[in-house]
Amino acid sequence: MKNLLFGFVCFGIWPVFSQSTLEQQFIDIEPKVIAWRRHFHQNPELSNREYKTAEKIASHLKSLGLEVETGVAKTGVVGLLKGAQPGKVIALRADIDALPVTERNSLPFKSEVKTTFLNTETGVMHACGHDTHTAILMGVAEILAQNKNKINGTVKFIFQPAEEGPPPGEEGGAPLMIKEGVLKNPNVDAIFGLHIRSNYEVGTIHYKKGGTMAAVDRFIVQVKGKQTHGGRPWQGVDPILISAKIIDGFQSIISRNTKLVDEAAVISVGKITAGTRFNIIPETTEFIGTIRTLDPNMRTLIIERMESICTNVATAYGGEASLQVEEQTAITFNDSNLVDKMLPSLEKVVGKENVRIRKATTGGEDFSYFQKEIPGFYFFLGGMTPGNKKFYPHHTPDFTIDESGLITGVKVFTQMTFDFLNQ
């Protein structure tokens, strides 16, 4: 794999680029990346509270001579590296926040951090791999800073807080970074992001053109009927019955109105609130759920059908119903032209056979908001020991990854940067 990468570097674009020098730089950076990852893993911080994480990132970027901006979207850090010649601007993004999860494994760098989250005592853990993303991007920054005389253009390193979502009542994450101008001054031409996966083998890269992760919407339906005695339902209007009919109707949208051979879609109800006593039919009910879509037109269709079902079903049973939809994340939509341009970069690092097309998932990712502004490519990095089919899912207390996969992330981001800026 190294021969493919460095052969391209030597003979494809940079004839004066030293294969042995770059190879040694990767060898030297790997233990640093692993050490950074372990530090962040042992010292995790929740969304919009990544103060010490941001300090360590900023200190490293400043030591490399980068222009550094802190306090972006509360705790974000942005580093700017200007190459030897002017040119295009590329952004590389890593998320830096942890989760309110109590770690259960026996790693020597296991998190022992405790906090109160939503009035509940909990541990704090990097249970989604953001510690690895942060360490990888710090490593990329060091490699590119050492070779900035080979860069034609500018690299913007975006260390983003609150990907998991800001605390209730706060702004944060990618939308706030965009609002504060992270893609401006200089204007970014394209953005790249990665996510490590505990179920993909080390040395593999996984991607999908178009919708790769779902738009996530939260919906609230409020139903109004007429309260009455449970023994005399004919004297009232039962909002629980209306809610049941609406929920049933929502599932018919998926099975009868969406073209599932194109993309997947999901409507799930997660909470229903109604009534006070077993013998009273209540006045109102409320139920809350999520919509997951991978196509913007399908999302529009689903919401329109949900509105129609709410109104018409409630009217048919003598009640009223309202639907409120709140966007949580947009569709993580990989620009097809950009993917086509960058696939050779991935293949040079891990080999064509290890760059694999994946199916879309119905999880969400706020990298999607960057992609709404500029072309972007979001892909997945293997973090499972080869041959070991046992893995622990993300967002669980036992989650862990094989650290030998981190250097692949450093190499891939480095290759993509050189290729994009020198095309």
What is the predicted role of each segment?
Residues 114-125, 131-132, 143-144, 149-271, ...:
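Histidine/acidic-residue-rich, glycine-tolerant segments that coordinate divalent metal ions
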Residues 63, 244-423:
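Metal-dependent amide/peptide-bond hydrolase catalytic core
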Residues 40, 79, 92, 130, ...:
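Divalent metal-coordination and catalytic microenvironments
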Residues 19-125, 135-152:
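Acidic/His- and Gly-rich active-site-bordering loop/insert found
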Residues 27-31, 44-55, 127, 131, ...:
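Soluble non-cytosolic domains of exported or imported proteins
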Residues 1-21:
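Bacterial Sec-dependent N-terminal signal peptides
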Residues 21, 28, 32-35, 39, ...:
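Extracytoplasmic/secreted proteins, especially bacterial periplasmic and envelope-associated proteins
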